[in-house]
Amino acid sequence: MSFVIAVPEALTMAASDLANIGSTINAANAAAALPTTGVVAAAADEVSAALAALFGSYAQSYHAFGAQLSAFHAQFVQSLTNGARSYVVAEATSAAPLQDLLGVVNAPAQALLGRPLIGNGANGADGTGAPGGPGGLLLGNGGNGGSGAPGQPGGAGGDAGLIGNGGTGGKGGDGLVGSGAAGGVGGRGGWLLGNGGTGGAGGAAGATLVGGTGGVGGATGLIGSGGFGGAGGAAAGVGTTGGVGGSGGVGGVFGNGGFGGAGGLGAAGGVGGTASYFGTGGGGGVGGDGAPGGDGGAGPLLIGNGGVGGLGGAGAAGGNGGAGGMLLGDGGAGGQGGPAVAGVLGGMPGAGGNGGNANWFGSGGAGGQGGTGLAGTNGVNPGSIANPNTGANGTDNSGNGNQTGGNGGPGPAGGVGEAGGVGGQGGLGESLDGNDGTGGKGGAGGTAGTDGGAGGAGGAGGIGETDGSAGGVATGGEGGDGATGGVDGGVGGAGGKGGQGHNTGVGDAFGGDGGIGGDGNGALGAAGGNGGTGGAGGNGGRGGMLIGNGGAGGAGGTGGTGGGGAAGFAGGVGGAGGEGLTDGAGTAEGGTGGLGGLGGVGGTGGMGGSGGVGGNGGAAGSLIGLGGGGGAGGVGGTGGIGGIGGAGGNGGAGGAGTTTGGGATIGGGGGTGGVGGAGGTGGTGGAGGTTGGSGGAGGLIGWAGAAGGTGAGGTGGQGGLGGQGGNGGNGGTGATGGQGGDFALGGNGGAGGAGGSPGGSSGIQGNMGPPGTQGADG
């Protein structure tokens, strides 16, 4: 016997669509009627006239048939529309009597037993912790439990009757000051068919205590799976712990155990539910950060496998696999260990869970893989402390004859982490009787301190001044050169500005050249931290006591990735050229801008971490079976990426040529930009895990498992990008811009990691870093 359903809304929509299609076809037929029925003869002869009449008769026959088809289509659409209306009326007419009939059937059972024959149980009110109502005795799901008031447990889910699912447990109340309350237990599934209800989530922790435990999943009857355990309550913040995940419910005679609930922060995952007679144990819940995963549920009394262990939280072990069925079944696999996370359990990864044991007949479960090692920290360049001290200024010299100002003194050296001091300014050179006046050279920047000190900036050049009456020339002093960055890395110092050349009479004036920018020092740029070692793999489970193979040991965890190298330090900016200034008819020429400093080399990437130790294989059954193979050592971590090379310093701007007396002016040339620094070398890939697990012992008939191999070496880190070349300095008025900085070299790829001995393969060499960007012309 087949069953047919009708949805009035769908029928109405279909009728509307068919009506639209019919309208479109009728419009097309009407448009084609005249051209097809009134075919004009091709010529005046009898044959052409006969052909035109023949084709015209075909068209007339088609349009006559089309008219009949259109009438049938309209009748069909009308019938479909009427049918939809009839279904709507029938539903409305029959709903009330059926509901009344169901009420008559349920009333005696409700009065006598407190539950209906057919129907779902009522949900418990939230905030009261009231349990969910039971489902109908014959058919119906249990109601959901109500959530608990603050600090009070959630209500239990209602039980199903013969057929139906248990209700979900209510959420536990949050703790105001104390602990969160437990979630409600899931309702029991149907006696014949149905799944157990999910346990309620635990309440969140109060200010100082722990979160509530998740509710246990509901059990079930003949056919069906146990309910999932509820999640543990959340932690309230620093110093508090979340709740443990609820255990999974027990499976039916034919059914699986429920999965355990996830643990809150710092709390274990729930244990998987046990299978009854035929089925698989439930999987363990995921552990919260710093806590292990839940163990898998045990297999049934007769035939079935154990549940898998839950994943470990950050830094914690995976759950152990559940034991196989008492008569026949394999042990469950161990859960994977949690990855290492900084600040959680010392930054160590979790070990893989052990595989579950078989009982009489069956193979042991495989051990879980170890967690991934902690990633290395990225290199960080030290900062530079400002230095308030400066070099001594040069002596001012003024008098008859050629006069030259004294040179500025060098800037004082910086202390640890301190920048070098600024060089002293050059002294004034002033000729009072029209001879040459030359400014003193600015002092060199002070030596940078170790551990990140920046190079000191060069001092400004002194002013050169004369009235030119004796044919003298005014020349500004050169700016001092910037100092190189510190030995342990530092930014190069800026070059000093060239001094002004000022001729108040008829002679020429030349601005001083800017100082050269100091080189950035990145040779000892900060290296990335080394990655951590991967976690150990879990041991394989024991094979069945009579017949069965041992479980394979879990692989060691992958080593952590090395940290990236820090960027190289930038080169110093070249000093600006000095101004040439005349008040008469002489030529005024600005000074040339200083060269930009070289960029520093990028830091080396950190070495990848070593792979973890493989787990041991499980022993075989006592009579017949093979021992489990040992787990392989973990794969080495990838080396860190090399740091980007430091940018070259920009060239200094050319000085301006300025006159107030009508003389010629020439702008100074802009300085050449500095070369960008080479990219850092990529980190070496981590060594593969050198220790594979031991093979398990064989049975009376069988042999031992093979020892685990060593892990592959990690991939070498990628070389850093070359630094960008410095921009050429802007030329002074009327001068050509400075030349752009050269391309920088890309960093070398990192060496591949050494494989474990023996059997580990070496890591792949890192890629060459691309060249830096050429600096723009001024």
From Swiss-Prot:
Positions of the UniProt region annotated as Disordered: 125-163, 372-510, 718-778
InterPro entries per record: PE-PGRS_N (IPR000084), PGRS_rpt (IPR048996)
Residue ranges annotated for the PE domain, each copy included: 1-92
Entries under Pfam families matching the protein: PE, PGRS
Biased composition (Gly residues): 402-429, 436-510, 718-763
Gene3D superfamilies: HP0062-like domain
SUPFAM superfamilies given in the database record: PE/PPE dimer-like
Similarity comment: Belongs to the mycobacterial PE family. PGRS subfamily.
Protein name, as recorded: Uncharacterized PE-PGRS family protein PE_PGRS46
